[in-house]
Regions:
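Intrinsically disordered, low-complexity segments enriched in small residues
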Residues: 1-95, 99-380
C-alpha cells in the first residue's frame, strides 16, 4: 500500500550506545497524530519520564515533520523541534521554516528522535536514509556560521542542509537555539541547550526524495490560489516587501505606530525613531526564499560585520533588542541579531531577559555587587 505524503518511518538515535533503529508507523497513526508538535508531544508523553531534568540523557530531542511538509507550496517548508524545555521543565516546541524542513521530509523519515548523550562531541549525517554518527571535536567551540561552512565544504554546499548549535547551546544557555541555513532559527524553549547537553553539534541532511501526495493537481490548485492572493494580504505584503517584517513596527502608512520601551514601561512613536523602514533600507541586502514559497519573508539586513549569511532577521528582534532594552541605535540592534545567529541564541528570550534584569537593577533588586561593578541601566 502506497503512503501518500509521509514516509511511514521514525528514526531513533541513541547517542550513548551509538545505535540507530527505525520504527514503522501505520497510516491510521498518522491520521491521529499527523506530525509536527502533535507528533513530538505524543512521543514525549509516551516515552520521556515526567520528572527528569531537561538535560538528563533520557530526555528526547525530536525533530518532526508533518503530512504535507516539504511539498511545493507556501508555508510547507517547516519542521518542529520538541523536547523537555530547560526553561519551563515542560514540553517545549520550536518552529522553524526554511530548506532544512524540506530536507528532513526528504531524508526518508518523518521524525528523528534522539536520546542519550555522546561521550565526545558528534554530529549526525543522514544521507538518503543512511545514518552515521561522526566526530565533531573540530567543530565544537565554533559558531554556527563557522560550523556550517566547514560542513558545507566537506559535503558540498549545494547538496546538504545543516542544523547546528553555537557556543550558547554548548554551554547550556537555557534559551539557546538551533540554527539552520546560517541564520534561520528554531529559536524557542532552549532546544539548542538540550542538543548541547547531548554533545550533539549538528545534523547534516544530504539528498532528498519527497513522498508523493495523493492529489498533486489539487495541491497545485491550492498553491496557485495562495500565490495569487498572498500579495493582497497586508501581513503577507509586509513580509514580502523590502525591508521585510522586521520593520513592521513602522505602520506609518496605516496608523501611528508605537514600540515598547524599557521593558514596556513606556512607548516610542516609531516614525520619529531610528526604526523606520527607510532606516532599515540602508542596511538591506536581499531576501531568502523557502522552497515552494514566493513570499520571501526572511530578509538579510547587514550591519557590516562581514558575515552576510548570518544576517537573516525575524521581526521579534526589533521589539526585544531595540527600544525594549533602551537601545535607540538600529545598527547596534542589527549587530545583536547577527551575534544571536552566530552563538545560537533566541533573541526574543535574550532581549526580555536583559530588559527584566535592567528593570530589576533600576528597582534595586540587582546591585553592582552582583554585576562586577557594572551599571545595568536601560540603554547602557
Amino acid at each position: 500500500m502506497r503512503n501518500y505524503g509521509f514516509n511511514s518511518k521514525i528514526l531513533r538515535i541513541d547517542l550513548t550506545n551509538k545505535t540507530t533503529s527505525v520504527e514503522t508507523m501505520e497510516e491510521n497513526w498518522y491520521r491521529i497524530y499527523g506530525g509536527g508538535g502533535l507528533m513530538g508531544t505524543y512521543f514525549m508523553l509516551k516515552e520521556t519520564p515526567a520528572k527528569i531534568d531537561a538535560f538528563d540523557p533520557q530526555n528526547a530531542l525530536i525533530f518532526a515533520s508533518s503530512i504535507i511538509a516539504g511539498q511545493d507550496g507556501p508555508g510547507l517548508a517547516m519542521f518542529r523541534v520538541v523536547t523537555k524545555s530547560p526553561l519551563s521543565q515542560g514540553i517545549g516546541e520550536a518552529r522553524c521554516e526554511g530548506p532544512w524542513g524540506q530536507y528532513l521530509k526528504g531524508s526518508g523519515y518523518d521524525a528523528i528522535i534522539i536520546t542519550g548523550k555522546a561521550k565526545d562531541p558528534v554530529y549526525l549525517l543522514i544521507e538518503q536514509g543512511e545514518v552515521t554518527i561522526e566526530c565533531a571535536k573540530e567543530l565544537w567551540g565554533k559558531n554556527t556560521n563557522e560550523a556550517t561552512q566547514q560542513l558545507e565544504q566537506r559535503y558540498g554546499a549545494e547538496d546538504i542542509q545543516c542544523a547546528v548549535i553555537g557556543q550558547a547551546g554548548e554551554n547550556l544557555v537555557r534559551y539557546a537555539s538551533i540554527v539552520t541555513a546560517h541564520s534561520i532559527q528554531a529559536a524557542r524553549m532552549g532546544t539548542g541547550a538540550v542538543m548541547g547537553s547531548k554533545n550533539l553539534k549538528g545534523i547534516v541532511l544530504k539528498g532528498k526524495k519527497i513522498p508523493q501526495v495523493f492529489d498533486p493537481e489539487g495541491l497545485r490548485e491550492v498553491k496557485e490560489y495562495f500565490t495569487k492572493n498572498m500579495p493582497n494580504n497586508e501581513l503577507s505584503m509586509w513580509q514580502k516587501e523590502a525591508p521585510g517584517f522586521s520593520a513592521s513596527a513602522d505602520l506609518s502608512d496605516y496608523d501611528t505606530a508605537y514600540m515598547g520601551v524599557d521593558n514596556f514601561k513606556a512607548n516610542l512613536q516609531v516614525e520619529t525613531s531610528n526604526y523606520t523602514r527607510s532606516k532599515y533600507m540602508e542596511y538591506y541586502k536581499g531576501h531568502h526564499t523557502c522552497p515552494g514559497c514566493d513570499n520571501d519573508c526572511i530578509k538579510y539586513i547587514d550591519p557590516g560585520m562581514g558575515i552576510p549569511k548570518a544576517t537573516g532577521i525575524h521581526q521579534e528582534v526589533t521589539g526585544t533588542m531595540g527600544p525594549n532594552i533602551g537601545n535607540t541605535n538600529l545598527k547596534t540592534m542589527l549587530e545583536a541579531n547577527v551575534l544571536c545567529n552566530l552563538y545560537g541564541l533566541d533573541p526574543t528570550s535574550l532581549g526580555f531577559s536583559i530588559s527584566f534584569a535592567m528593570e530589576s537593577f533600576e528597582n534595586g533588586l540587582i546591585s553592582k555587587n552582583d554585576l562586577d561593578g557594572k551599571d545595568l541601566n536601560f540603554g547602557n
